[in-house]
């Protein structure tokens, strides 16, 4: 999902092919375990370089299942959430999934990052296991099989949404794109943005790229600025975004910046003395923390109380993914796999990241929050659909 993720996952896969170990197990019971519990599996990187994402997503799922158990569980039984650590490695993830099968799971909430999720989906296809990823944005995930769903939007979906926003809300006529050519996430957003922008009659005056390890973007920015775009799309993650926006402002760029959910957290890495570099920036995200929605605010409060930290979009999506699976099982009236998959396909769920139904590819149909950054603060610029 993330640029950083893509790099470490590639390294982890190489290591896994040469010396694959048994995944460390973390079994979490979301409430009092007893005979006759409904066992739902979870997969996430709980250790390793991408553990920050796995911990957040799995914490969100834990909170959801604990709330459900406190309210009586589902189908008259408590949920036993069995969570395994796959360390961000596709081979480890498949091994962990096999362990979950041995433990008798009836559904799976996971995985978190895209490469392990695709690997597990290929294996889960054989079992018709009801499976939902909270945060795997690679479009290929849900194309694997009819039993695979996702709670988040896709990379191309974000690009299309931001192109529509730029055309309809910002009324721009000329935009540029600067993206990471070595990252699927960045490339997926960039390509979809370009296609959608041009379809809206917006000129894409420059389409520039850079490598994963680059930290000097002045050559590309100079080329971009020579054509005077009104906005620049930066479909990358907040550490890189902070570098690019600073260099662009230093070169005299005064237009808008656009981005995807990888921007979430950029205010935490830009020094207050330079915070104005982010003025007139807009990025897509799964929710806006200051949205007055009652369910969202309840989640934010409960999560902070339980885990002593502020939730991020990974946590929110983990929560929604768990609740989606539980609702599908409840609607199915049993843990029969085919019945649960059928119920999920027809679900209508009111979540904290939006009201969710699924399209024919089992991707969520929901609105996306576009966040504006001005004066070092975030505000909701719009809620946008594709």
Summary of predicted features, one role per range:
Residues 305-315, 326-377:
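Segments of small-molecule ligand-sensing domains
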């Amino acid at each position: 999902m993330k640029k950083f993720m893509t790099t470490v996952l590639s390294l982890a896969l190489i290591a896994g092919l040469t010396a694959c170990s048994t995944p460390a197990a973390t079994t979490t019971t979301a409430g009092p375990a007893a005979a006759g519990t409904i066992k739902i599996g979870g997969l996430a990187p709980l250790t390793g370089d991408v553990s920050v994402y796995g911990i957040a997503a799995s914490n969100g799922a834990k909170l959801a299942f604990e709330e459900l158990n406190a309210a009586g569980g589902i189908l008259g039984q408590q949920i036993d959430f069995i969570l395994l650590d796959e360390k961000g490695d596709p081979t480890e993830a498949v091994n962990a999934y096999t362990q979950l099968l041995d433990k008798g799971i009836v559904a799976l909430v996971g995985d978190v990052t895209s490469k392990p999720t695709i690997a597990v989906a290929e294996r889960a296809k054989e079992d018709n296991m009801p499976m939902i990823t909270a945060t795997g944005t690679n479009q290929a995930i849900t194309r694997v099989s009819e039993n695979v769903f996702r709670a988040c939007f896709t990379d191309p979906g974000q690009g299309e949404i931001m192109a529509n926003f730029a055309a309809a809300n910002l009324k721009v006529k000329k935009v540029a794109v600067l993206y990471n050519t070595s990252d699927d996430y960045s490339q997926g957003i960039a390509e979809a943005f370009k296609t959608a922008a041009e379809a809206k009659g917006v000129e894409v005056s420059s389409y520039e790229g850079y490598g994963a390890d680059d930290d000097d973007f002045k050559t590309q920015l100079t080329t971009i600025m020579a054509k005077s775009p009104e906005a620049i799309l930066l479909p990358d993650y907040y550490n890189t975004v902070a570098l690019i926006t600073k260099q662009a402002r230093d070169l005299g760029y005064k237009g808008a910046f656009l981005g995807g959910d990888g921007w979430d957290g950029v205010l935490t890495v830009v020094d207050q003395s330079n915070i104005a570099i982010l003025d007139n920036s807009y990025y897509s995200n799964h929710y806006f923390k200051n949205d007055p929605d009652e369910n969202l605010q309840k989640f934010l409060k409960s999560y902070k109380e339980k885990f002593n930290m502020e939730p991020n979009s990974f946590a929110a999506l983990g929560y929604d993914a768990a609740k989606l699976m539980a609702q599908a099982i409840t609607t199915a009236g049993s843990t029969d796999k085919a019945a649960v998959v059928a119920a999920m396909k027809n679900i209508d769920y009111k979540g904290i990241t939006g009201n969710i139904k699924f399209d024919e590819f089992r991707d969520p149909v929901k609105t996306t929050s576009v966040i504006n950054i001005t004066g070092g603060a975030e505000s909701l610029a719009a809620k946008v659909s594709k």
